[in-house]
């Protein structure tokens, strides 16, 4: 199971980096990048830091879910795993100044969907992430059902973030851009399955 765990974590980290790069590349360079020598290096460092930060935030709920799925498969009590998850999600959201019951609930729901997904992957046979998905779901339609459920849960998280942070156009634009990048990456995965 350890090898599968590592395959899943590596695939999710790569997915997070690709989404981040897609979001950052969409942001155009300012005129200062062409006029001020060295601005490229400053921007490169800033974007590298942003990629690292975003990947960390994108991975946090996924890492929680992967670890929880592994603990459940090892025989841990579901109640203790779920209570730890709820506490970890609340602490994480508080650290981001996103303490909202609606957001915590939406995040918990998404993590529960991911736990079910990762449990299937960890129980499946395969030597690659795509093989694990194919063997865990058995059909394109079954996997697509998971993707649709997860996408709806992520949209609910975005709505809760907007509600908490205020109806800010820049925030909405950033969340929409992120959702679009996630959709593009998931479609690419779907093209290679079944």
How would you describe each model-predicted region?
Residues 95-99:
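Active-site-proximal loop/hinge segments that shape catalytic or ion-binding/gating pockets
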Residues 114-194:
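Long, helix-rich, hydrophobic modules that act as membrane-proximal anchors or helical bundle/coiled-coil regulators
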């Amino acid at each position: 199971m350890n090898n599968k765990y590592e395959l899943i974590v590596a695939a999710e980290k790569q997915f997070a980096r690709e989404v981040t790069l897609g979001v950052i590349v969409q942001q155009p360079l300012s005129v200062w990048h062409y006029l001020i020598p060295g601005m490229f290096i400053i921007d490169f460092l800033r974007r590298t830091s942003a990629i690292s930060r975003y990947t960390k935030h994108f991975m946090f709920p996924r890492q929680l879910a992967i670890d929880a799925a592994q603990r459940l498969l090892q025989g841990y009590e579901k109640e203790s795993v779920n209570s730890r998850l709820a506490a970890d999600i609340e602490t994480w959201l508080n650290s981001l100044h996103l303490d909202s019951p609606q957001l915590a609930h939406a995040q918990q729901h998404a993590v529960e969907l991911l736990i079910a997904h990762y449990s299937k992957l960890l129980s499946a046979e395969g030597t690659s992430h795509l093989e694990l998905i194919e063997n865990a779901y058995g059909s394109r339609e079954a996997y697509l059902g998971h993707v649709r459920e997860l996408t709806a849960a992520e949209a609910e998280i975005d709505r809760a973030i907007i509600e908490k942070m205020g109806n800010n156009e820049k925030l909405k634009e950033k969340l929409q851009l992120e959702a679009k990048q996630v959709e593009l990456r998931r479609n690419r995965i779907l093209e290679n399955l079944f």
